Amino acid sequence: MPPKPGPDREVTDEQILTAIRNAYSPAVGTSDVAERVGAQRQTVDKHLRELAEEGLVETRMIGRVRVWWLSDDGRRYIDDYA
């Protein structure tokens, strides 16, 4: 089990986009992304909402869970970054 993320854990947009791209499913929940990057869920949620405003990820609610996936622009961005 990975170590519990600390409150000061810095995470980059690129780490989040890469975590979504490398996920087992095309759409992932906020907690899944947070676990993959080793950051707190609230921190990742803030980043994801900003990325959605920039058009790099898309989101929707499925039941009570918000899921995220890369937009076409997000795929191009992270492919160019990698």
Model features per residue range: what roles?
Residues 61-67:
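Short, Lys/Arg-rich nucleic-acid/phosphate-binding segment
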Residues 48-49:
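Short, hydrophobic-biased segments on the C-terminal half of alpha helices
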Residues 75-82:
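Short, amphipathic alpha-helical interaction segments positioned at domain boundaries
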Residues 32-34:
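A short acidic, leucine-rich amphipathic alpha-helix
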Residues 21-25:
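Short helix-capping/hinge SLiMs at alpha-helix to coil transitions
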Residues 55:
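Glycine-centered, phosphate/nucleic-acid-interacting loop/turn motifs that mediate DNA/RNA or nucleotide
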Residues 1-17, 81:
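Short alpha-helical segments that sit at the start of domains
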